[in-house]
A protein has these predicted regions:
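Acidic, serine/threonine- and glycine-rich low-complexity intrinsically disordered segments
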Residues: 180-317
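Beta-propeller fold detector
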Residues: 61-74, 109-119, 155-171, 220-229, ...
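Short beta-strand elements that form the blades of beta-propeller/WD-repeat-like
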Residues: 33-45, 83-93, 128-140, 185-192, ...
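Repeated scaffold domains used in trafficking and secretory/extracellular systems
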Residues: 71-84, 116-129, 168-179, 231-241, ...
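Intrinsically disordered, low-complexity segments enriched in Gly and acidic/Ser/Thr residues
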Residues: 279-375
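Bacterial Sec-dependent N-terminal signal peptides
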Residues: 1-39
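Beta-propeller blade signature
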Residues: 52-57, 100-102, 143-154, 201-220, ...
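Post-signal peptide N-terminal segment of secreted/secretory-pathway proteins
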Residues: 51-155
Length: 406
């Protein structure tokens, strides 16, 4: 996913005008590089353009270029999700109509399936065979709109509203950081925001975490669970939940709540747990990441299996509500351990790292996009067992913004 943390106005596109869907008549294959990996790349020396879509057959060696390859998308900001063996590319329209373009891979090449007119949402996740999308208000008193998109039919099959203003019970409104399917329910962690008063994303309640639990597919609110040991879960447009093979759900807090533009949480960046089959925080589990890492806070993570997460982190000096950390480490939530990854480029040479990365979920491996300040871009293979990073595929012509596989 493109680095949404650098600009809080970034959001994802939602399918709104299904009647305006247009099928690609020729269903032409559009990528010259065969392979089931999909890399999105923002071209160098270009402004106001969206990512190129490139395919590759491996991430560990070779060179891939935007020159004469891939698909140039329209629009500016794009966000991505893969589910049901399809790749969804979603345009954020910035006040104009957006689009959702759907692809699959045939014989190692991207093939366009459909294109939909859109509007803007701020949280989304695969649930069963659907994409669940939620448009979240930033003004107190307004309701959130949800949409269920059937990923076989590429149709909206159900929609409704959520009363986010009454979730908090404290006079502020709830803003979901993300959505996650947990068994047959949808967990929606949220932060409490004023949504007014020249402090829209500020809060008077910085030291609590909440998760709204919804039935699926009815989206009926079942309960709200709360934990006062951390600040809110995840961050704006960042998935702060990870579900293990045994069904346990882990949650990270960055501790980046603000009041009046100033960090106000007294809680450290930490990890908590909701045990499988329950809808309560486990008060016997708490992992103080800030202490374990020598004072850093988690900004993103990706679950790779076996209790291991690859995490991005920032130091206290680098801390920001929308900053993506360039310090890479391995967290094992079972053992409550943190190991810094070696082999990454020097920190002062890194321009950006991708938020949306790929893992085969083998308990060991993740692939992360890194773009250096000199403009060169590479995929790095992260080995959780050895806590090392190895430079792999070189990408010429732009900044890597996401890595996926179909």
């Amino acid at each position: 996913m493109k680095s949404t943390l650098k600009n809080a106005c970034y959001a994802m596109a939602l399918i709104a005008g299904i009647s305006s869907c247009s099928k690609d008549k020729s269903n032409d294959l559009i990528s010259e590089n065969k392979g089931n990996y999909i890399l999105t790349v923002t071209p160098v020396a270009s402004t106001g353009v969206a990512d190129y879509l490139l395919t590759a057959d491996n991430l560990e060696s070779g060179t891939l270029s935007t020159a004469g390859n891939g698909l140039e998308q329209d629009g500016t900001f794009r966000y991505y999700v893969t589910t049901n063996n399809k790749f969804f590319s979603m345009l954020y329209g910035q006040g104009n109509p957006g689009a959702v373009t759907t692809y699959n891979i045939q014989n190692g090449k991207l093939s366009k399936l459909s294109n939909f007119q859109t509007e803007t949402v701020q949280a989304f996740a695969p649930v069963n065979n659907d994409l669940l999308l939620v448009k979240i208000p930033r003004t107190y008193g307004n309701k959130a709109n949800w949409y269920q998109v059937d990923t076989d039919k590429l149709l909206i099959t159900s929609e409704g509203q959520l009363d986010v203003a009454n979730l908090t019970g404290n006079g502020e409104t709830a803003h979901f950081s993300w959505l996650k399917q947990v068994n047959n329910k949808v967990f929606a962690p949220y932060f409490s925001i004023k949504a007014c008063c020249a402090d829209g994303f500020g809060t008077n309640y910085p030291d609590s975490a909440w998760v709204a639990v919804y039935d699926y597919p009815s989206m009926k609110l079942e309960k709200i669970i709360k934990d006062n040991r951390t600040s809110f879960i995840g961050r704006y447009f960042v998935d702060g939940l990870g579900v293990l093979e045994n069904g346990d759900t882990y949650a990270f807090s960055s501790s980046v709540a603000t009041t009046g533009g100033v960090f106000s949480s007294k809680k450290p960046s930490a990890i908590t747990r909701i045990n499988a089959g329950t809808t309560e925080f486990d008060q016997n589990y708490y992992f103080n990441f800030q202490d374990a890492s020598g004072g850093m806070n988690i900004t993103n993570w990706i679950y790779i299996g076996g209790g291991n997460f690859v995490v991005n982190a920032t130091t206290a000096a680098e801390k920001g509500a929308y900053n993506t950390g360039v310090h890479i480490g391995i967290v094992n939530v079972n053992n409550k351990t943190f190991k810094a990854v070696t082999g990454m480029p020097d920190l002062d040479k890194i321009g950006s790292v991708t938020d949306h990365n790929f893992t085969p979920k083998d308990g060991r491996t993740a692939y992360m996009g890194v773009t250096l300040k000199d403009g060169s871009s590479f995929v790095y293979k992260i080995d959780a067992v050895t806590a090392t990073a190895t430079q792999g595929l070189k990408v010429e012509g732009g900044t890597i913004t996401s890595i996926s596989k179909l």
